[in-house]
Regions:
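Active-site residues of response regulator receiver
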Residues: 78, 110
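Helix N-cap/capping motif at the beta->alpha junctions
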Residues: 32, 53-65, 86-89
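Receiver (REC) domain active-site loop signature in two-component systems and cognate sites
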Residues: 81-84, 126
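A Lys-centered signature of the CheY-like receiver
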Residues: 132
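Active-site beta3 strand of CheY-like receiver
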Residues: 70-76
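C-terminal catalytic ATP-binding subdomain
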Residues: 1-15, 47, 137-148
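Alpha4 helix (beta4-alpha4-beta5 surface) of REC/receiver domains from two-component response regulators
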Residues: 88, 102, 113-128, 141
Length: 148
């Protein structure tokens, strides 16, 4: 039942996945759509990241709180999800009483890329915003920026 996806490097993009060593970096991907989740995980694994997933904001919050401090290095958070949406989950993570709750980068992933959506993501405590469908080049840029 897997989805095979082929990726092409854009012409002129001479960066390759081996540019930066992300081994040991752990990412939590929060996405309720199975196909979008699989695509995101494939992209992130191509870059050498260790990935875990959650199907909604409530599960993401539960995983974050159950993990030791500093366990996750980055969170990619879908916005529109059942049970608890991405905005609610980001606010709940930021409100947690542990040191990594304030500093972990949370990146909104959504099909809505309007400026109002970006503002709402930032207001909810997210650090940045990336639109679906993913472009590997943009994903690499965001990861480089937040996993320095």
């Amino acid at each position: 039942n897997g989805v095979a996806v082929e990726y092409e490097q854009p012409a002129g993009d001479n960066e390759n996945a081996a540019d930066i060593d992300y081994s040991g970096k752990r990412v939590l991907v929060v996405e309720d759509n199975a196909i979008n989740l699989e695509i995101a995980l494939e992209f992130l694994k191509l870059l050498g990241l260790t990935c875990e997933s959650a199907g909604d904001g409530a599960e993401a919050l539960e995983k974050f709180l159950a993990a030791p401090e500093g366990y996750y290095d980055l969170i990619f958070m879908d916005i529109q999800m059942p049970t608890m949406n991405g905005y609610e989950a980001a606010r709940a993570i930021r409100a947690a009483s542990r040191s990594d709750a304030v500093r972990i980068p949370i990146i909104a992933i959504t099909a809505n890329a309007f400026s109002e959506d970006v503002k709402m993501a930032l207001a909810a405590g997210m650090n940045a915003h990336i639109a679906k469908p993913f472009e590997l080049r943009l994903l690499k840029k965001i990861i480089r920026q937040w996993l320095k």
